[in-house]
A protein has these predicted regions:
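Helix-loop-helix hairpins in multi-pass membrane proteins, especially solute transporters
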Residues: 82-215
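Hydrophobic alpha-helical transmembrane segments
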Residues: 12-18, 44, 69-71, 98-106, ...
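Alpha-helical transmembrane segments of multipass membrane proteins
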Residues: 107-108, 173, 229, 233, ...
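Hydrophobic transmembrane-helix bundles of small-molecule transporters
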Residues: 176-286
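Alpha-helical transmembrane segments
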Residues: 31-34, 100, 220-228, 352
Length: 479
């Protein structure tokens, strides 16, 4: 047995030193997965930074919100289909195509003379990026021994966290010293290089033996697409009747999608009982949908509320919100070597800390001081980092073998569905609490208090769902 194989075959409940992990022979696979995730994470922030220059050049200000929404729609739909695609065709081909689609979308945006072609490019970026990230999570569960899964996910989390800083920096540099079109060409070049790298790597072919001969579920994907479009559009311009109707219709479509998918047998896109907390897989996905729903308020409304209530600059408010990414990265890197027998504890502590951070926002955002808001943001991200690092390893240990790729691919997809639902939900709450009629810091403080209080029930549902993942399982007796 080789040295690398011997290390990987050690008991997964032993501590994993960074030195062992980084010299284990999985470095190239780790770099590939990390780059795929970073491209997807950084792209949105780069585009947000370049957006004013893009609008000044090609116009289309009325469609600004759709540059984000259409990307998210593509990401969610492609992410949902990724598990089934990898089960049929393996990892190498689909991942390479997803990276190529992402690059093609960037190229289309780079040459766009108007907003129409740019939106087509954003749709391609969404389909490519969403599929790429979901397949990267499948790769984490398949290409790495479970002993190394937490370390691998910690590195991916670090790259995701770095995107919070490097994304706006890259976008700003292109706008300041070149032009926004070169920014898209930069990402296109990286994507095409990644596509070629994936296609030429033999190790990623290890999944190509699990093919299944099923029809591709276009009707279910169309239903999911419709659900996300309705929910996203409902949150773009918040009006009580219009928004409630659109989001209600979107949620009904989402429920219909889940029901139809559950009856599809081996053709399922998602694992069995995807939102049933009585099953470990359902508990995991429900938790990963509800907690992002509960935490999106600080990103969406935090900067504006801080500038009104506390008079902070936009830059300071942005750094406060970025503390969430810092907390996530630091926590993930710090604890990822923990033995597997502590996974349940870290998941429970992490999600509890995230929930407590929301309670902290209820006080800190309206009352201050600003450093306390930053501490709460650090705790929110840190809680996610503590838990998220071990969720993949935990669920791959207790989930049914036939659902392994479905659950790993569904993790980022359900997160994005949660963010979409959460953005629409807090949009309604903000509108109902007087956000549009804010005139004084006291008014803004009242809105902030209501917003974060309304997020607490969502977090509690996520905590209850978490119990289905961390409760004792027969597998735990082997640790």
């Amino acid at each position: 047995m080789s040295e690398h194989a011997a290390a990987a075959s050690k008991r997964p409940d032993e501590y994993v030193p960074w030195r062992e992990f980084l010299t284990s022979g999985y470095t190239a696979s780790l770099a590939l997965v990390s780059l795929g995730v970073w491209l997807h994470a950084a792209d949105s922030l780069v585009v947000a930074t370049m957006l004013p220059a893009m609008i000044a050049d090609i116009g289309g200000a009325a469609f600004v919100s759709w540059t984000v929404s259409i990307y998210e729609i593509g990401s969610i739909v492609a992410g949902a289909a990724s598990a089934l695609i990898t089960m049929r065709y393996g990892l190498r081909g689909p991942m390479s195509i997803a990276a190529f689609l992402f690059g093609a979308g960037c190229a289309a945006s780079a040459i766009s003379p108007n907003m129409g072609l740019l939106l087509i490019g954003r749709a391609l970026q969404g389909f490519g990026g969403g599929g790429l990230v979901a397949m990267c999570f499948v790769a984490l569960g398949v290409l790495f021994p479970r002993r190394y899964a937490a370390r691998a996910l910690a590195v991916v989390s670090a790259f995701w966290g770095m995107s919070a800083f490097l994304g706006p920096l890259i976008g700003g540099l292109f706008v300041e010293y070149a032009n926004w079109r070169l920014g898209f060409w930069f990402f296109a070049m990286l994507s095409f290089m990644l596509s070629a790298w994936i296609a030429l790597r033999q190790e990623t072919a290890t999944l190509e033996q699990g093919k299944i001969g099923t029809r591709f579920p276009l009707s279910r994907l169309a239903l999911l697409c419709l659900a996300v479009v309705l929910i996203s559009y409902g949150g773009v311009r918040v009006e009580a009747l219009r928004t409630s109707a659109l989001i209600g219709a979107g949620v009904l479509c989402l429920i219909w999608f889940f029901r139809r998918d559950g009856l599809a047998g081996p053709d399922r896109l998602l694992p069995h009982a995807p939102l049933d907390p009585r099953h470990a897989t359902g508990a995991t996905l429900l938790m990963l949908m509800m907690l992002p729903m509960a935490t999106v308020a600080i990103t969406a409304y935090g900067p504006l509320l801080m500038t009104v209530v506390h008079g902070t600059s936009a830059l300071t408010a942005g750094y406060v919100v970025a503390c969430s990414s810092i907390g996530w990265t630091l926590a993930a890197v710090s604890v990822s070597g923990s033995p597997e027998r502590f996974d349940r504890i870290w998941i429970a502590i992490g999600m509890a800390v995230t929930t407590l951070s929301i309670a902290g926002f209820v006080y800190a955002v309206p009352a201050g001081p600003v450093w306390l808001i930053a501490v709460c943001a650090l705790a929110e991200g840190g809680g996610f980092g503590l838990a998220y690092t071990f969720i993949l390893r935990r669920i791959t240990a207790v989930a049914p073998e036939e659902d392994m790729q479905r659950i790993t691919g569904a993790i980022p997809t359900m997160q994005r569905i949660g963010y979409a639902l959460g953005a629409a939900y807090i949009g309604i709450i903000a509108n109902a609490s007087g956000f549009l009629s804010i005139q004084t810091p006291d008014d803004a403080g009242t809105v902030a208090r209501i917003l974060f209080l309304a997020c607490l029930p969502l977090a509690v549902v996520g905590l209850v769902a978490m119990l289905g993942l961390v409760r004792r399982h027969p597998y735990d007796a082997s640790l």
